[in-house]
Amino acid sequence: MTATFPSLPQIDVARGARLPRVCIATWEIEGPSRNAGIGTAYTSLADALKRAGYDVTILFLLGCHPTDGNMIDWVDYYRTEKGMKLIPLPMAHEPRIHAAWASSVSYHTYVWLKEHQHDFDIIHFPECQGLGFYSLLAKRQGLAFTDTTFVVSAHGPTFWVKEGSQDYIRNLGELEIDFMERTSVAVADYLVSPSQYLLNWMQQNGWELPERTYVAPYVLPRTAQLAENGATRQKNNNEIREIVFFGRLEIRKGLKLFCDALDELCADRSGPKFEVTFLGKETQLYGRSSIGYISDRSKAWSVPWHIVSNKYQGPAIDYLRGAGRLAVISSLSDNYPNTVLECVGAGVPLLASNVGGIPEIIDAADREKVCFEPRPDILAQRIRNAIDHGAPSARPSTSFGDTERKWVNWHAGLSNRDKTVSPVRRPRDESRESIFPLVSVCFAYNVREKGTAATLASLKQQDYPHLEIILAECGSDDPSPSDSSSKSNGFKAHEVRRISRRSAELGAGRNAAAREAKGEYLFFIDDHCLLLASNAISVFVQVAQRVDADILTSAVSFYLGSSNGSSENRLEHSRRPFLGGDAATGAFVNCFGSTNALVRRDAFETVGGFSDEAVSTLDDWEFLSKAALMSLRIETMPEVYLWYREDQDRDSLVHSLVNGVRSARPYTTPGRKVSPAIELALSRVMQFGQGLKFERDANTGTPLSRGEQGPAVTG
C-alpha cells in the first residue's frame, strides 16, 4: 500500500532571528566531485542557504582526495567565490582503524564532528553510503551532539542502486553499507526525500523511517533557472537535429535502452537524419569502460555520434540549451534526477522515462507529452516524432522559488523547534529494571595465564554504585567452593565472589559466572581487557537503558603489551569500531562486538550462553550471531571504553579455522524460526554468496551456470 508523506512544514521566520549554523557532511559536492547527483543537490542547498545569510560549512568526507582537481584550489574557491568553508575531513594515520572503507570514513567523521559539535546547530548527511552512522548512533545514545539536529536526505540507497542497475553484491563492504544506511535513516532527527517514490520504496523494503519524515524537492541550481513565467519557455523546438543522452553512462540511467532505441532508428534507412551526443560521466559497464561499450554498439548506427564527459553541471545545461538539441533521460530506475530537474528548470526540450520519482518533477499536464515507458521501441518512436514534429519543454510540478524559500525558512526554525521535542528513542519496559540495576561483572580467566592484575585494577576503580564481581578461575587445581566477601582484594564496597573450575574453557567459565550472578545485567570481561575510564560501566548501563539494548558493545582500542609488562606502558596502535546487530555482515565477520559487553540477563538466557567447547577464542562471535538471529537488539557505541592488550609473547588463536567455522553454526541450525527483518538479512547473505560466485566465474572464465565438478565416484 502506497503512503503519502507530508511536505516540509511552512515556517515563518521572525525578523532578526539568529540563523542556525549549518554543516553539510557529504562525499559529493560540486567541484571536488564532477557530475554527481548528491553533490549537485547539496551545492544548490548550500548556495540557497548562503544567499539567505546562513553560515554554511561543507565537510568533504573524501578528505584530500577529490575525484577532480586539487583540494587546495577547491578550498580557496569555496572561500573566495562562495563565502563558505570547505573542509577536507582529516583522517589520522594513527591509530589505524580496523574497518571497511565506509565504516572507517564514518568513524573519522564522528571523531571530527564530536570535536567540533558546538560549532554547528544542524548537520546534513546523505543516506547513501551511511557515512553519518557513528555520529547518529552517538546522538541516539546520548554520548554527543545533544544540541545538534541531524537531517538525513534520501538520495538513493546502495541496494536500490543495485536493484536498478541489475547488479549483484560485489563485496562485504556493501553489506555493511546497507546496514549503516538503514540505521542512519532510522535514528535521524529528520529524514527528507525529494520524492514520495523513494520513501515508499524504503518502506516496502523493510526500512524503518523516523517519525519526522518529509518530502521536499531539490533546490534548483541558479545556472538552470528561467523566469517562472510560462511565456519564457519554448513551446516547441521544431528543428531537432541532435539527440543527447543526458546522464551517467550506465545501465541504470538507461544507456543500453538508449542504444537499443538507436539500433531501431538506424535500421530504418529512410528514417530522419540526426546526430547523437552522450553527455555524461564515464563508468564501468559489464567489467569494461562504458565508452568502449558505446563504441561497440555504434557499429550498427548510420548516424554520427560523440561523447562529452568533461562538463560540470552548469556547462552541461548550457550545452543542452543550444538550438536543435533534445535531451533524453531514459532511466530504468531513478529517484529525483537532477538531469530532469535541470532540463525542466532551464526550459530544455526533453523526453524522460516515467519511472521512480521522475513524474513528480513534471507538471501533471505535461507528463504525457514528455514521459515515456522505458522500452526501446517506444523511445525510438518518441524520438522519431520529436524530429518530425518538434519537442516541447516541460513545466515543473512545483514552483522553484517556493521550494527554495521553504528550505531556507525551515532551517531557520529547525534547531529551536527540535529542542522542544523529546529525543527519539526506542520505548523500553520500565518495569523490568531499576534506575541503577545490579550489574554482575563476570570475569573468567585462566589461572595459568599472567596479566589479570591490570584487569582487576581497572574493575576496582569503577564508580557504578550497584555492582557485584564474580571471578571464575578456570584451570584451577583446587576447585574449592565459592566464597564471598564484601570488601575483598580492595574492591571497595563491591561484592566479590570467586568460583574455581578445573576446566580451562573460558566459555564454560563465563557461563558458570553467569549462573552465580544476581544482576539484571551481566558485564563480561576477559583478562586482556582494561576499563580505563572509571565511569565505563556506568556509561554502558546508561546507554543500554536509553536505547533499550539487549546487548551493548563498544569500540575497542588495541595496545601492545606483555603479560609481564606494566599496564602503564600503553601504546595504542589500532582501533576497532563495530556495527552492532548487522546479521547479514555477521555471517562473514564479527561486526557485532567483542566478548567484553553488557548483556541483559534475560537476553543471555534466551541465547543459551557461550560455547562450552575447549577452543573458544571466537565464542563471542557465535554468541552474538545467535542473539542477532533471535532479533535481540545489539547496539554498539562508537566511543572507546575498552582497551585490549595484544601480548607480544603469546600467539593468538582468534583466526583459527576451527573457531571461524563454529561462528557460522547459528546460521545453519535446522528448524530455526526468524523474524521478517532477519529473513531480509539472510537474503542479503544469499545475494552476496551469489555475487562472489559470479565475480569468480567472470574472472576465471567459468560458465556462470556451472561450478567446479570432480569425476563421479562409482565405488
Region locations from a protein language model:
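Acidic donor-binding loop at a coil-to-helix junction in glycosyltransferase catalytic cores
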Residues: 616-623
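Short, acidic, metal-binding catalytic loop of nucleotide-sugar glycosyltransferases
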Residues: 457-466
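Conserved donor NDP-sugar-binding/catalytic core segment of glycosyltransferases
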Residues: 535-568
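Conserved acidic donor-binding segment of nucleotide-sugar-dependent glycosyltransferases
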Residues: 368-377, 385-390, 501
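Aromatic "clamp/platform" in nucleotide-sugar-dependent glycosyltransferases that forms part
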Residues: 332, 502
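A recurrent flexible, glycine/aromatic-enriched loop bordering the glycosyltransferase active site
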Residues: 507, 579-599
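Nucleotide-activated donor-binding/catalytic signature segment of Leloir-type glycosyltransferases, i.e.
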Residues: 280, 290-319, 488-497
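Short aromatic/hydrophobic "clamp" motif used to bind/position activated sugar donors
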Residues: 522
